[in-house]
Amino acid sequence: MASKYRGYYHDEASSAAGGGGGGGGGDGYRREKQVRKKRLTAQKRKEIKEAFDLFDTDGSGTIDPKELNVAMRALGFEMTPEQIHQMIAEVDKDGSGTIDFDEFVHMMTDKMGERDAREELNKAFKIIDKDNNGKISDVDIQRLAIETGEPFTLDEVREMIEAADENGDGEVDHEEFLKMMKRIGFGAGFF
């Protein structure tokens, strides 16, 4: 039973938000991320190059942690020093402690994908929360199930709510929704 509604949440929430669905845990998200990397437009690559050159303040051809922090802030990402160092470690293939342009492109493509996944989940939440009260109730899920032709009993719907409802109020708020989606593997990269 649990796998049934996990697939439902993943497939319906992601397709409601324009995602690819997939139902295979995080496989659909990973597949979308790979396609997105391949589709990096020449314009986006040019913008990333301009940002790289702008923030490579010493002209070394690499970005160090201080330069990366400034770059990320300028691109709309507020990050702690620990997050900056972790980002560098994740893409720094040569262990230099700095990021060259190719490493920067890889990192920024991942960050853009994370932002896209969060936007998809936010859209999905709004679609499910039809009455716009900031919470998903059993009524919201039953309505969506009817609209999509998914035959769920009231007990199944309540079980779905209980699985995600951390504060015990009988509804799923936005934060609980994001945590639940992380548990089932959708958009795991941005958490």
From Swiss-Prot:
Region span, Disordered: 1-41
Amino acids binding Ca(2+) 1: 56, 58, 60, 62, 67
GO biological process per UniProt: microtubule cytoskeleton organization
Domain EF-hand residue range list: 43-78, 79-114, 116-151, 152-187
Protein purpose: Potential calcium sensor.
SUPFAM superfamilies listed in its UniProt record: EF-hand
Taxonomic superkingdom: Eukaryota
The keyword Cell inner membrane belongs to this UniProt entry's keyword annotation: no
Chain sites annotated for binding Ca(2+) 2: 92, 94, 96, 98, 103
Lineage: Eukaryota, Viridiplantae, Streptophyta, Embryophyta, Tracheophyta
Skewed-composition ranges (Gly residues): 17-27
One GO term describing the cellular component: centriole
Protein name, entry field: Probable calcium-binding protein CML8
Residues bound to Ca(2+) 4: 165, 167, 169, 171, 176
Keywords associated with the record: Calcium, Metal-binding, Repeat
Species of origin: Oryza sativa subsp. japonica (Rice)
PROSITE patterns the UniProt entry points to: EF_HAND_1 (PS00018), EF_HAND_2 (PS50222)
Pfam families the UniProt entry points to: EF-hand_7 (PF13499)
Binding positions (Ca(2+) 3): 129, 131, 133, 135, 140
Gene3D superfamilies with a match to the protein in the record: EF-hand (1.10.238.10)
GO MF entries: calcium ion binding
